[in-house]
Amino acid sequence: MERSTRAWMSIVVVQAMGSVWMCYAKQNSASHYTSTLPALSRAHALPLALLCILRIVLIFDFRNFSIHIAHILLSILTAIHTMTEVFFYQSMSYGIVTVTEVTLNSFSVVVMLTFLLSPSFKNEQEGKEKRARKVTAKHYMEGEMLTPEDDDELVQAYKKWK
């Protein structure tokens, strides 16, 4: 399950990079905005870029619960932001770019929540807990090992030599 969700994250990262590129490219900057002001596109690119960076961090540190929560919250906020820009403020046009962005963010939230609530995530977390170590070998510097008995033949040979 982890491998599939990581693969999904890499697909969504590529999509987010494309959305950020569209916000900064001159020929396509007004393709999803009703106004042709480049400031609107750049303002929309910031949460997309932050979400893209967070997803890249999540791919490399996939077992971090707090990054998962931050990713889920930022995905929800980005989807809500895009929907309010389209339907409430009507500053963005309803098109393939905005629909894809909202759909992929919403689906990412569902996929990540499914992964976080799955037993495979919980089993890996339980396996990483610290447990008491068993003694596998006795150290020679402990206890009576520093003072050998006098009847030992190595001790007697040392005394004769000295």
Swiss-Prot record:
GO cellular component terms given for this protein: dendrite; endoplasmic reticulum membrane
Transmembrane spans: 7-25, 40-60, 69-89, 96-116
Keyword Metal-binding: no
Major localisation: endoplasmic reticulum
Tissue expression summary: Expressed in tissues including muscles, intestine and neurons.
Knockout mutant characteristics: Hypersensitive to the acetylcholinesterase inhibitor aldicarb. In a slo-1 (ky399gf) gain of function mutant, restores normal locomotory speed and sensitivity to aldicarb.
Record localization: Endoplasmic reticulum membrane; Cell projection, Dendrite
Membrane topology classification: Multi-pass membrane protein
Keywords assigned by UniProt, alphabetized: Cell projection, Endoplasmic reticulum, Membrane, Transmembrane, Transmembrane helix
Family to which this protein belongs: Belongs to the ERG28 family.
Biological role: Promotes the translocation of slo-1 potassium ion channels from the endoplasmic reticulum to its final destination at the plasma membrane, probably by shielding from premature proteasomal degradation in the endoplasmic reticulum. Maintains the levels of slo-1 potassium ion channel at the presynaptic neurons.
Protein name, entry field: Probable ergosterol biosynthetic protein 28 homolog
Organismal lineage: Eukaryota, Metazoa, Ecdysozoa, Nematoda, Chromadorea
Gene: erg-28
